Amino acid sequence: MSERVILAYSGGLDTSVAISWIGKETGREVVAVAIDLGQGGEHMDVIRQRALDCGAVEAVVVDARDEFAEGYCLPTVLNNALYMDRYPLVSAISRPLIVKHLVAAAREHGGGIVAHGCTGKGNDQVRFEVGFASLAPDLEVLAPVRDYAWTREKAIAFAEENAIPINVTKRSPFSIDQNVWGRAVETGFLEHLWNAPTKDIYAYTEDPTINWGVPDEVIVGFERGVPVSVDGKPVSMLAAIEELNRRAGAQGVGRLDVVEDRLVGIKSREIYEAPGAMVLITAHTELEHVTLERELGRFKRQTDQRWAELVYDGLWYSPLKAALEAFVAKTQEHVSGEVRLVLHGGHIAVNGRRSAESLYDFNLATYDEGDSFDQSAARGFVYVHGLSSKLAARRDLR
């Protein structure tokens, strides 16, 4: 078996320390793999050089922005996926893509071991390792942060002692994960639930309590569930996310302060920013309200929740998720049209929707002249619909 270790590299504290630590403690060569998911910040060339400076024998950078948008963000929209009705799976959907590219790098660079920098308290360890087991069960997994009980203080001390080029201090110990779909911030004083987030935590959104300028009205167009236009201009999925990140972020839309149930059994607090994601999910959900038949819509809302739970729990490659997506593909056949939304003061308000596939019938819905609804049929419908309840009540009154 090869002694090379293929490491999922973010450029942050834990994975930078991991490169040096693996080399010093095990003698194995490390190939660092950094994936560009549209996270912005440092240039990927800088991240690549940092990996080399930390001791990696090779550092691979993969531009996966379009792949991430089309293959991972889009399914999140199609499934209206909000874990616990709030979290749009910012980090969760990125992990299976990283796993895919780490496995590819292991095959290309002769690696028999894959490594990640996740702790034993988080969900990401599960997402990575279940992903590896699904795609490459022959690979060994190394998790130094978890298996050797690193704390952030220990990692910072190791970085300082070994001159690892990483900008993290004990006074600013936030853990940040970001991509084009959103941004997640945790640890530090945020671990105390009563502490309000400070302004410096946010990067994707403006302060909605200050920016009370002109509201931004945007029209998002869909074809078979897929976002295809913004204000009538054709866009790719990536371009749609980027445009709505910019516009919704300027209005303070997409800030989320969440206490969520982690897979490992604990509750954790996360601060999320996902302006474009929240606009797209809101618009898509609204268009489904117009185009899906009642029973289909009801059932899909159940599968939406289950899909979000599967992805959150690291089961991206599971048979159930694949089966749900086959169902969802069928539901999207008529989800075409446009939704108009107003973005302002941190809020999203839908104020218009139109679709050639709409099930809304004006003549049936109107209370004015032209009403074509046969109200004489209502009496019998109400009687039959409530008959079982009536019979049960009659029995209970005996």
UniProtKB/Swiss-Prot annotation:
InterPro entries: Arginosuc_syn_C (IPR048268), Arginosuc_syn_N (IPR048267), Arginosuc_synth (IPR001518), Arginosuc_synth_CS (IPR018223), Arginosuc_synth_type_1_subfam (IPR023434), AS_cat/multimer_dom_body (IPR024074), Rossmann-like_a/b/a_fold (IPR014729). One of its GO terms (biological process) is L-arginine biosynthetic process. Disulfide bonds: none annotated. The keyword Cytoplasm applies. Its EC number is 6.3.4.5. L-citrulline binds at Y87, N123, R127, S175, E260, Y272. Its main location: cytoplasm. One of its GO terms (cellular component) is cytosol. PROSITE patterns: ARGININOSUCCIN_SYN_1 (PS00564), ARGININOSUCCIN_SYN_2 (PS00565). GO terms for molecular function: argininosuccinate synthase activity; ATP binding. It catalyses: L-citrulline + L-aspartate + ATP = 2-(N(omega)-L-arginino)succinate + AMP + diphosphate + H(+). Homotetramer. Belongs to the argininosuccinate synthase family. Type 1 subfamily. NCBIfam families: argG, PRK00509.1. This is Argininosuccinate synthase. It comes from Mycobacterium tuberculosis (strain ATCC 25618 / H37Rv). The lineage of its organism: Bacteria, Bacillati, Actinomycetota, Actinomycetes, Mycobacteriales.
